Amino acid sequence: MDTISGYLGTHHRRCDQLCIDAEKSVAAELWDRADAVFQEFCAALEQHFAMEEEVLFVAFEKAIHGTDGPTAIMRVEHNKINSVVFMLRDALARRAKNAFLGHADTLNIMIAQHNQVEDDIFYPMLDRMFGAQKHELIEAMRKIAESPAADPAT
Ligand SMILES: [Fe+2]
Ligand SMILES: [Fe+2]
């Protein structure tokens, strides 16, 4: 995967698929499977945000000499997404099927809007901006993706 768009776009789709699997498991009341898949989703999302916030956004902010551009908005959106994930985790722990599915609808809309801006505008812009240096950024992100995920319950 030799572009930021390709690498992170693929990761977006992986997160989406895990979220769909978790919803399907909850809808079918397959709770053990839902626990396992939701945990995998949380870990993937946490790694995704870490790749963006600790590598990509930092490189962008350094290049534009500022932190109050689009990355500030995206960091706020990550926090909002995380607060909905927290509600999903709580609903799952309570085996509250309808609450989980309701929060999942909200989450899907928030993530779709956020990812659309990244996929269509932000990542392609970074691919152009960083030229050959993008390979170093992808390598740094890959290291985060391959590191063991923190326990999402902590
Ligand atoms: Fe993001
Ligand atoms: Fe993203």
Regions picked out by a protein language model, each given a short descriptive name:
Residues 1-154:
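Small-residue-biased structural context
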